[in-house]
């Protein structure tokens, strides 16, 4: 990565601005998944160990109007972070700017940390955070001593005041360890993979993944397709899909992708189908690709798992984005488990999960430690897989 990293700058005695991704699920004031907080710890600890004074910025959820602030404060995150670091985390509820914040920042000593309230509280008045208001970026930059560390891969595909805005107003904008790792794993896998390179794409919509499929058809040796988007590809070939999910307006796109894939695009050959999505009374496997009338496909079937297992044999690089079925329901998680088993058993494989639902599947089903890398960013990893430049990364200082 040709950008400066946190190890390239002198931190001692400096007020260091850090964009982290603490956009974690909070229910009734309790954090239900702290993975993103844990992922940011190496960078935060490094800054504190080097004698820096860390000023952290993050958003939490979407905030469009005053009422949306309810339950969106970073207060539970400040408490959780303090417990993880074993030290006090300064935090002023509801405050994203002003004299009180400035006084707290200026009172910081070496090795101390302050968390600014949810950056999207600034969106209530004209979307200042989300639209990268130049004055806001300049103001937040003024709180520090010219160093900005971006460690929020999850928002690197957005040009917001708290990443791109601050970057434009500091002497040095550098990558944190998490951002550095994310780029190293995902970009390296796509641009310079050890072969065979197999990509696996699931999820419900073809429309979300068109750019990714097109880019990976050029880069990968094989692209396996599962999940709900299977049925748009099936219908495009005239295969019966019953009541399965389909994007009628993407049938031509699916057909075109199949035609230009030169056999690289590998589809399921059977499905696990049910007579309803939720309150079903009958679940069975299809004989072949076709879904029975009145049924909908909710997972790939055993023949497909075997086919994908064979396609993955000998793979040296695997990138996976999107589950094979409705994995949250035990009745429809066999496909996702089967594909994970097929990936992790390959000797010497570099296996990368591109965030979102696939990351949740790996973590919830006990496979997290079996993969080389699990991305913390859904949208950002998708854009990297698509070959796009990420604004948050582009804004960092060149080496």
Curated annotation (Swiss-Prot):
Keywords: ATP-binding, Cytoplasm, Glycolysis, Kinase, Nucleotide-binding, Transferase. The keyword Kinase applies. GO terms for biological process: gluconeogenesis; glycolytic process. ATP binds at residues 209, 297, 328, 355-358. It catalyses: (2R)-3-phosphoglycerate + ATP = (2R)-3-phospho-glyceroyl phosphate + ADP. It is an enzyme of class 2 (transferase). Its EC number is 2.7.2.3. Pathway: Carbohydrate degradation; glycolysis; pyruvate from D-glyceraldehyde 3-phosphate: step 2/5. It is found in: Cytoplasm. It holds the Pfam family PGK. Substrate binds at residues 21-23, 36, 59-62, 120, 158. GO terms for molecular function: ADP binding; ATP binding; phosphoglycerate kinase activity. One of its GO terms (cellular component) is cytosol. Belongs to the phosphoglycerate kinase family. Monomer. This is Phosphoglycerate kinase. It comes from Streptococcus thermophilus (strain ATCC BAA-491 / LMD-9). The lineage of its organism: Bacteria, Bacillati, Bacillota, Bacilli, Lactobacillales. The gene is pgk.
